[in-house]
């Protein structure tokens, strides 16, 4: 896992926004929600923005997380989605 300090900074459960930046494609938001659903089932309404040139999309989804390990796992799995450049 990652060596983070989320457990020192957050009181769990906590609302945590994940922003995923990836190559522009219609299914990126669906792929992000599918990964989140596997670990934290719920009803998610991601927001999407295209870059100024339209080459990239950023998808933001707020997730209620229950542990630092859950945050770290989501960072790892979201980064593994095809075409993803960054997870913030």
Curated annotation (Swiss-Prot):
Domain of life: Bacteria
Name of the featured protein: UPF0250 protein Shew_2940
Disulfide bonds: none
InterPro entries on file: UPF0250_YbeD-like, YbeD-like_sf
Family per record: Belongs to the UPF0250 family.
Organism, as annotated: Shewanella loihica (strain ATCC BAA-1088 / PV-4)
One Gene Ontology CC term in the entry: cytosol
HAMAP family from the UniProt entry: UPF0250 (MF_00659)
